[in-house]
């Protein structure tokens, strides 16, 4: 495989748009190779010998942002979250941060455990093992849960969706903490830039409640967003809401569990918290 000319990447990064557009630069094979080489150099310490492939495209109308399948990373550089940032260098840092986040999932997310958890739930079983039922009320709630998921296939689908969503929220916080601790250089700096922009974008609890009224959003979406804010940043943007507000109280009741999951290096143990 031909080596990537990283000096040329830096040159193109500083070129005026009249010579090369952001779309041309960020979707070029040169830039994708630059990220692939960066990942290879950074992950060598983990004896991670498989080359991470990068696919970057540009579509401002596509709601897809970024994802990994544990083999490759796909990023939509034309997503409004990226293009609202002005300047090619600034956009480069955001895309680098997005790549660092997805690379974090490749390095630290237990994809097999996550899929097994999903499949077990589909078979009406807990994975890796049942939650601790400390009280008779806990036992009643567990029985009610299984009755609910067995009642209708759509109920099971919803339970799996919620479990997968919460698992991803926890993993987002976990992998970013690991990336920031282990890669303080180029990848860490890009991730910090991304986190700053993302945190500014997170709505307050007051705004989330307003969206429930104006956009018909479910209260779970608000609670999940508050959980994400805490899991990633250790902060909740309350807005004008008191600490007694029900959504805030739900997340407060889960903080010990969230902290336990964020500190666990075992993907299976994080799934126990999800249960």
Residues of each region from the PLM?
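Basic/hydrophobic alpha-helical interface regions
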Residues: 1-212, 228
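Pan-zinc metallopeptidase signature
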Residues: 184-275
